[in-house]
């Protein structure tokens, strides 16, 4: 074992040993950013970058299991990403489909899709639906795979779903306007029934949310990590948890 690897392991163990698992976030959202830049820096192809990022996911979920995280939301494909050239998009969708199948077949995690299924190719829709069905009763971390996801799209879809529900009930616009509140909209989000994210991690050094979980992250803590997603290490994850535990969450008060 190289000296650098030994020092890294000892340091990671030290950071982990000082973590208070009771203070750990229960729901972590992750913006998996930097695959293409990692590939460029490594002299690889864009597809190789996306594959390296996909390979990191199960490793990261293992770290979440070790630290008692209950829900993880992984932003794998945004609505904007669907506008990429077909020569890049189709291989990326193949990687996402294979990754979701792998998460489902692993047997440790319950997979749930968040996003607009209707804007995705039929094959991708099928893979996501089958993964949900196959893992419905798994007693493990709930893994939200955000594919075809956009924060503004989610809110628009929630409002549309709410309006259609009340239209079926015969509720007039005046009646709906009188009773409408935050909870009514929250009940129609992709993540309805789930806790909001306590911590949102974004890799690659970008310090913006880009529309990720706009509604749910109102009181989330954010951690921006300089490394590209494929290079994200356990020690980076542990540092994010350490940083989160050191903060005093005010929830707007």
Which positions does each model-derived feature cover?
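Flexible, compositionally biased loop and terminal segments
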Residues: 1-253
